[in-house]
Amino acid sequence: MKNLILAIESSCDDSSIAIIDKNTLECKFHKKISQELDHSIYGGVVPELAARLHSEALPKMLKQCKEHFKNLCAIAVTNEPGLSVSLLSGISMAKTLASALNLPLIPINHLKGHIYSLFLEEKISLDMGILLVSGGHTMVLYLKDDASLELLASTNDDSFGESFDKVAKMMNLGYPGGVIIENLAKNAKLKNISFNTPLKHSKELAFSFSGLKNAVRLEILKHENLNEDTKAEIAYAFENTACDHIMDKLEKIFNLYKFKNFGVVGGASANLNLRSRLQNLCQKYNANLKLAPLKFCSDNALMIARAAVDAYEKKEFVSVEEDILSPKNKNFSRI
């Protein structure tokens, strides 16, 4: 029976392929190859290198799941938003595969995929708030009863995850910065450094991390010799202030929207400090908290495959001749 959907994810620096049963939501195959070590020496993602590594990794993974090809009913691929050259690597492969196997092609918005990471093995729930925090995005969404999405808040500049990467780079700690900063903060012996919470007295429902990032830079410049203890102290102050900022704005949003269900997705949602605070916030407002599994917080093809299951039912197919690359499109209005 042809009931399997193969999905490809290559929006940034993770190459991933997954195969899901559209009837049972059972994962038949999932593989992910990270490029973190390859980019770490540059302190961030190099697009051209990412594209080359995708072109090497994706064919290898396809060979590993070839046994399932005879049961495929569709090919899905991330087409927006992301790095152009990275997206194109996955799209080109998806189009080739769809054409060769004579299967429908399903483009999937990467951010929508993250939302589906909450529902990998179950039907999607509606009427809930969602915090999406990653290396490229920071936003709060309202998933309404009619499956429409309303953007409640987004960042005016840097994202939550991006700010961790940049602070780590300032202190020559490596890439990616999220886990490095989090682990360093846990080892802080001194806690005398503090930073102002961004937009603390603003009623605007928005995030901003550029000012905090600059405050960290100025603090680093005060120290001629940045020893490990000082780095840990700065990491602790930065992480807590960044989390304070997220929680401050979420508190305002909860007061306005009275969510009974709240989901958290994206690579940066793996931060344990943030997760703990979110649990406390939802307890305070008597809301059910749904967290994406740690294994599937970061970019992966299984969330794309899961989103494609619902897209398949709606027949959201495109021609392999159609230009579906949309690297900057963050506007998605429905699930």
Swiss-Prot record:
Origin: domain of life: Bacteria
Location in the cell: Cytoplasm
Gene3D superfamilies referenced in this protein's UniProt entry, alphabetically: 3.30.420.40
Entry annotated with the keyword Magnesium: no
Any GO BP: tRNA threonylcarbamoyladenosine modification
Cellular component, GO annotation: cytoplasm
CC cofactor note: Binds 1 Fe(2+) ion per subunit.
GO MF, one example: iron ion binding
InterPro entries: ATPase_NBD, Gcp-like_dom, KAE1/TsaD, Peptidase_M22_CS, TsaD
Pfam families: TsaD
Obligatory cofactor(s): Fe(2+)
EC category name: transferase
Keywords, sorted A to Z: Acyltransferase, Cytoplasm, Iron, Metal-binding, Transferase, tRNA processing
Reactions performed catalytically: L-threonylcarbamoyladenylate + adenosine(37) in tRNA = N(6)-L-threonylcarbamoyladenosine(37) in tRNA + AMP + H(+)
Classification via SUPFAM superfamilies: Actin-like ATPase domain
Residues reported to bind Fe cation: H110, H114, D299
Residues holding substrate: L132, V133, S134, G135, G136, D165, G178, N271
E.C. numbers: 2.3.1.234
Protein task: Required for the formation of a threonylcarbamoyl group on adenosine at position 37 (t(6)A37) in tRNAs that read codons beginning with adenine. Is involved in the transfer of the threonylcarbamoyl moiety of threonylcarbamoyl-AMP (TC-AMP) to the N6 group of A37, together with TsaE and TsaB. TsaD likely plays a direct catalytic role in this reaction.
Family: Belongs to the KAE1 / TsaD family.
Matching HAMAP family: TsaD (MF_01445)
The protein, known as: tRNA N6-adenosine threonylcarbamoyltransferase
